[in-house]
């Protein structure tokens, strides 16, 4: 969100020119389809209001603003009102290029190269596709972010102690509590977690967007999560509150301490480059947790060596690390055999195709390991699609995830 604001501030006139170009074509499409002046006037008024809001937000952006509400409104308007127009313009632009090209090479005269019915058909096609995309983004905001899905994964470990056969672990990630106005709307998701009857619940970071107070209203709700052997958590990049300004380093540190305390009140034991031992019938399972480690500019506070101190080499180890790049750059190259790493961070970009045989999201071009289970050099990584939302306050195609692992 910060990056989006900076880009728009620095390239304001270029972006404004692109928007003007879009609107010229859109107005042509509307004029092709209707002679009703009230429709044209209404569209112009709405457009001016939306662009006026954008201009105001970009010019008044400040890192002192801790709320994501205004940013969410801006992103939603962009996705619902502006992005779909690209489809309309694409259809009309192709028609214009075809007509201009035919004229330039002498195939037709301008008067014979204009087909109003073709123009009308292309306008309808563009408006139709744009309308569908807008409807999907609206649905994602209204319903999609609450369609939590349980994904079941069976994990086979060659040296798993017998006492842990059938052991059930639930992973959730990226709650981003500040993106939700009403905790009660997430009650069904908490019920889904408890219905899995987990032995252990692991949270892999980003409980908030910016500040600890976002999570305070959610403490009673997340306290309802039940797990026989406890609930553990690690920090994500957003938990450090790097995306808002602070009066002093002490104030920023106090915010982090407050967040950790709030998560403790909700029943989560925060692992900061350390481990915990789960023991059953004299046999052990080791749960490791590191602080966030990602490629710059993300924090690199994770210390795997510290988390491994005192852990037997032969032990089955499950690592919580928020950012999946930590797996590729550190974990899989580490001499210790960390059997399974659990991450989040990508959200699946909250948009894409997430079908059984077709998986695509724009985020895969930044994070090749963006969702599901991966294996590399004998070690496993699972990337959770996230529990909440950030920026765009919805989900299209990539649903919020609760992962249930059964050890075998």
Language model feature labels by segment:
Residues 116, 123-126, 133-156, 254-272, ...:
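A short, flexible N-terminal coil/short beta segment enriched in small residues
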Residues 10, 31, 63-66, 70, ...:
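Arginine residue identity/basic-tract feature
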């Amino acid at each position: 969100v910060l990056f989006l604001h900076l880009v728009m501030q620095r390239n304001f006139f270029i972006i404004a020119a692109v928007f003007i170009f879009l609107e010229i074509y859109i107005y042509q499409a509307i004029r092709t389809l209707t002679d009703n002046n009230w429709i044209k006037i209404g569209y112009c008024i709405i457009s001016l209001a939306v662009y006026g809001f954008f201009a105001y937000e970009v010019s008044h952006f400040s890192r002192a603003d801790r709320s994501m509400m205004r940013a969410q409104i801006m992103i939603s308007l962009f996705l619902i009102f502006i992005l779909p127009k690209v489809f309309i313009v694409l259809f009309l632009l192709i028609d214009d290029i075809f007509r201009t090209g035919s004229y330039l090479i002498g195939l037709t005269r301008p008067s014979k190269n204009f087909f109003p019915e073709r123009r009308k058909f292309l306008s309808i096609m563009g408006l139709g596709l744009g309308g569908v995309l807008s409807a999907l983004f609206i649905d994602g905001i209204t319903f999609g972010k609450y369609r939590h899905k349980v994904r079941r994964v069976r994990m086979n470990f060659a040296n798993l102690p017998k006492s842990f056969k059938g052991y059930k672990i639930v992973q959730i990630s990226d709650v981003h509590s500040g993106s939700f106005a009403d905790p009660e709307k997430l009650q069904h998701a908490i019920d889904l977690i408890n219905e899995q009857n987990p032995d252990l619940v692991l949270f892999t970071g980003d409980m908030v967007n910016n500040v600890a107070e976002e999570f305070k209203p959610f403490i009673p709700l997340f306290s309802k999560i039940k797990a026989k052997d406890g609930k553990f958590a690690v920090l994500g990049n957003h938990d450090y509150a790097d995306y808002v300004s602070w009066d002093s380093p002490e104030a920023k540190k106090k915010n982090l301490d407050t967040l950790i305390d709030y998560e403790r009140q909700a029943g989560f034991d925060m692992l900061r480059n350390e481990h915990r031992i789960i023991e059953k019938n004299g046999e052990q399972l080791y749960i490791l947790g590191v602080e966030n480690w990602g490629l710059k500019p993300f924090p690199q506070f994770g210390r795997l060596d510290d988390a491994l101190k005192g852990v037997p080499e032969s032990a089955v180890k499950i690592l919580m690390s928020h950012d999946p790049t930590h797996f590729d750059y550190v974990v899989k190259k580490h001499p210790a055999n960390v059997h399974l790493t659990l991450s989040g961070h990508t959200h699946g970009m909250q948009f894409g195709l997430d079908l059984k045989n077709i998986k695509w999201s724009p985020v895969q071009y930044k994070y090749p390991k963006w969702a599901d289970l991966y294996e590399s050099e004998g070690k496993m990584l699972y990337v959770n699609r996230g529990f909440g939302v950030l920026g765009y306050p919805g989900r299209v195609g990539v649903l919020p995830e609760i992962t249930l692992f059964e050890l075998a």
